[in-house]
Amino acid sequence: MKIKEITEFINNGVTVEEQTCDTYKIGNEENEVKKVAVTMFATVDNIKKMKEWGADFVIVHEPTFYDHFDNKFSEDVVVKEKYKLLEEAGITIYRWHDHSHCDKPDRIFEGKIYYLGLKGDEKRTNWGGSTVLTLDEAMTASEIVKLIEDKLNVRNLRVAGELNKKTTPIL
């Protein structure tokens, strides 16, 4: 299967703005795929792990080169290292951001809710198409932070507001 066939499949039926960041960042969409890796961030460490694993196609959600539309910071030492690693490994990178958020339901939001085990009613907002979850049972910000830390193994979260106030709507 070719890389472009995979991107056509995951984008099928989803309409996005004409100016989208969902593009190939490096590599060739005509290449045949042997191993696909999916990651939120194409960090140098992640690229090294994907290279070691033998991935030839990577689907990434956030910018690879530090700008929403991946305008190149060509003199940046980290950007240079990423390019070198990706070229050496023969990895094609496709950013899958807008399609994932424009689908109904929002696939990224759905994944977060699923892995956190939260239950509630989801609604799209008028503020940039964000999705809000109104929880079935109110939780405090402290409880939500603890849940994220425990379920997603994330540390050092920052919270603005009252940590012990119960809430039902969350973004």
Which residues fall in each region the model found?
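Hydrophobic structural segments
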Residues: 1-171
